[in-house]
């Protein structure tokens, strides 16, 4: 407690005197101001995203909170060689003293400064083994009796646990959240708290948090001012036309989203289960507590989108989406910009309408992120062994 108080006093004094903060001297800056030295009380490590200065954001679905963690990982680097780990689930299990069915890789995120790869992992602490639902993203399966672990993948492919004991961090509690004992009402049987946070992204001074709330429009996109501050949360309840379900929906959460621009204006490109793709203009979102998005594609029912990234090739921008029950999909940004709204149901199951996509080989892709302009890092399930592999795939494959 004494050390924490001293650090907070020095940070405050530096601010008053207009001096660089201690964190700036060690490589940090304004984004670390107001953080506390200690051990973040993360109950369940879920989705992750990186912000400026190498700050890691980690969603805590069970605790209904988001943590900002300074990993002190700010040395610029470029990865030019593939980093492949065959059987990464077995190696993680051995490292954490359990078996492969006793862990879940909830998310994968790349620090864009250092290009180090980080994994959000759950280790089961109660009965051994998770109950995987084959067509559902693993992040939905975080159990209440699992311990969060943060893993770093080195440039040489080694796995290192990142101790979250003495780190600089800050915490933002989410409003209108479900409690861990909230009733189960999903078709797939997951508790509502497991959907409190489904995806994160940092956008121009705000952390966007997709998921559910206990509001009338349960599907919610929260926007947290960062550095976190009291009263720094804005929320918008979202409605989207679900072509396969033949209705407008307000309870289905965004599964994955991408900050994007259409004709120079910022939007959120959001993908939902079963699988509508919708656009939400950010300027409109900031002015409304509830809003209806524009559905621009139906990518096929019985499927769950997992991750979405953007990349450029030959001067053109594309979107890459990984899925549970479909191949990976490549969509042209130009087609998204030209897309018309879809307001009528599909005529048959599994039909696709709206924006077209190119199917990309990559069955079993569970986690996906852009490593740099050369590589995409993917964790996929091996269809022969059933195990998990992590591979870095050249960008020109897509």
PLM features: residue spans?
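N-terminal secretory signal peptides that target proteins for export/translocation
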Residues: 1-6
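Bacterial N-terminal signal peptides
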Residues: 8-21
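Sequence/structural signature of beta-propeller domains
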Residues: 26-398
